[in-house]
Design a protein with these regions (language model features):
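PLP-dependent aminotransferase-like
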Residues: 1-14
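A broad detector of the eukaryotic-type serine/threonine protein kinase catalytic domain
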Residues: 8-11, 22-23, 58
Length: 166
């Protein structure tokens, strides 16, 4: 068999693949809304489909975990590819006995992250587009309006180019 990964926007690459008669199986990871569209299109030709929908990718940390080992994994799981992967750790579920220690240490690690151009030796690069940046800023604004307490915030390096999606 052959596995082809075709990057591109859904309206272009995705639509073309969904309607192509040579595609005999679809696998989609993403939003429920788009997953339903993929499933409906696949059903028209009775093409098998595998869907992983919804996201949130929680990371689970139990009280017997080695926090020193868990911490770098949790940070990387959240910021890999600037958090723009379907498996980005958007939630961390922590067992009560270690909650205080882990959240304090995680907040300290996150606060030390620096964001900027991908060519510099930084922990986190820019978001893919202004649309995505605006979307993320909208999530943060709604969280603040809902009274969510932020435990940490990273920083943008001072010499980051203007117009970057940081």
């Amino acid at each position: 068999g052959v596995l082809n990964i075709v990057p591109g926007l859904g309206e272009e690459a995705g639509e073309a693949l969904l309607k192509h008669p040579g595609v005999s199986h679809y696998s989609f990871t993403g939003s429920t809304e788009i997953g339903v569209k993929v499933q409906q299109e696949a059903a028209k030709r009775a093409v098998p489909v595998t869907l992983e929908l919804g996201g949130k990718s929680p990371q689970l940390v139990f009280s017997d975990a080695d926090i020193d080992k868990a911490l770098p994994f949790l940070v990387n799981a959240a910021i890999q590819n600037a958090g723009q992967t379907c498996s980005a750790a958007t939630r961390v579920l922590i067992e009560k006995p270690i909650f205080q220690e882990l959240t304090e240490r995680l907040a300290k690690e996150i606060s030390s992250l620096r964001t900027g151009p991908a060519l510099q030796d930084l922990e986190c690069g820019p978001l893919i587009s202004k649309v995505q940046k605006d979307r993320v800023e909208g999530f943060l604004l709604r969280a603040k309006q809902d009274g969510v307490e932020f435990l940490a915030e990273g920083s943008i390096v001072e010499d980051a180019p203007q117009g970057g999606n940081y």
